[in-house]
């Protein structure tokens, strides 16, 4: 039901799909950028569904407490994550360890959608856990985009991380530097790797 509604909104607002999607996008870490609006999620889920992809995504477990909302978000592919502060002496896996474990134990291909900006507000340093996850899980990094200037969205390219993080991150920053977000003042590529 929700995916159907998202598709109606996608079409009604004039969005178009960039096709075809790389084959690697079925088992990957999928970077989604720019992320400056809650609408990005609606359009991204609709686009990826139309491309035949069913990515999973992480979300705070607190949202699962709302029965109807939690159920709908789970149906969209949510992976519930405990982001509460650790208690003294508590042992808990890092987000990267959790994600690698998901790939290692999955019996099917799995793509995990991540927004490395970590917020809809402008940041100049992206979170890099997605890179380490892809490297350790031995899965490609695929670059999904939403360009509000052209109303085009999709998965543009995939590549295997080489272990040379600086070089690989420069590829990612170069890819996103000309993509127009909904709110341009709220987006920046990671200045540490901008070419």
Predicted regions, residues:
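Helix-enriched interaction subdomains in cytosolic or periplasmic regions
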Residues: 1-4
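Soluble catalytic domains of membrane acyltransferases
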Residues: 12, 16-178, 192-195
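Short, flexible loop/turn segments with low-complexity composition
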Residues: 182-193
